């Protein structure tokens, strides 16, 4: 029997005004929070006060829907936002999304390693592929198929990690007396003829106290799971029920072991929370926020997520089964699609699906603090998940409720830290400085 004590990990998703689509209309909320830097600073400080592992900022480099009745989800460039948060906080991890489809490895590697140094070793990169038509239109208009996207992603992640390691551990001498600053023999240069991007390196500066940033992945398709199993330290998932969560975690961990990983990735599904002093208060809060929802826009968003024609949908009827596409053929997130599809196959009406699921198909919890803590604990104790990426209904007051009311319960049960034990994100997550298998993948000789 293992003597290792598992530790619950919690992150906060900086989801614009909040996880609910109508959060921007909630009284007291800044409707333009998505590009208000002080909003993000306040949210990050709330998360750090609650001793959470990290804050997470998603990104789509496009306006992907009609903003006539809904503000964009996130607008500011993520690594710039997190650079500000790095100066306003001291311990909280800083995770940002950046696409492998519409970036170049050298620029991205440099940007995230700089963030890691500036923050004192608290940065992480959520590596995603991109296929949304709005984004494609901003980068030349050529749609890239899923297979090609993920092939590029695997090569991209390997190249970025190799660049992060390109300074080696003994390059800097910094001897003022002799005038020798560096021994360039220790540079770990890439062979341009052996990597897909013809990159040599090195980067313009060495790494941080945690070595290099944590790598996160969030794809639910077969190629996405493969990428996560091969390269990720942490995986963000969308699991609407425990059975799905268990199946997905078993699949990911088995594949990770096949790749020779010494440590399998941490699994953190998204969790949308509506918290009240009692269950009745929480239900009332959700009902009041739901009443602010633009159902026409919500139905359009659901149709896009499920890749079905919106004109074929009716609010008070189930989605016709013949309209449900093969998840392997859809352009959008497979994990989110599966959550919506499960509800559709239960015969739920479009209105019920919209009411049951917010924030792109993540699990939704409505209840008193004790109930939220109970559910988190029950999932964690199955071993299927290592924690959760918390998505409050309305970001600032929802995050405050989670930190002030739910976190103390988890602490009292011995599930969550009562103080930070380290200063870097690797220390918070318990991820070794070097994952031997992952580093082997990134070794310049293999590129």
Where are these regions (language model features)?
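C-terminal helical cap(s) of enzyme catalytic domains, especially alpha/beta-barrels
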Residues: 141, 145, 156-161, 246-254, ...
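Alpha-helix-loop-beta-strand connector modules within alpha/beta enzyme cores
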Residues: 68-95, 257-259, 399-418
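Hydrophobic faces of well-ordered beta-strands that scaffold small-molecule active sites
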Residues: 8-12, 55-57, 92-98, 121-127, ...
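Active-site mouth loops of central-metabolism enzymes
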Residues: 23-38, 97-106, 142, 147, ...
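N-terminal beta1-alpha1-beta2 module of alpha/beta enzyme domains
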Residues: 1-88, 210-213, 323, 355, ...
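Internal, glycine-rich beta/alpha segment that forms the wall or movable "lid"
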Residues: 6-8, 104-226, 230-231, 259, ...
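Substrate-recognition/cap regions that form aromatic- and gly/pro-loop-enriched pockets
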Residues: 332-408
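Conserved, mostly hydrophobic/aromatic
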Residues: 10, 47, 51, 85, ...
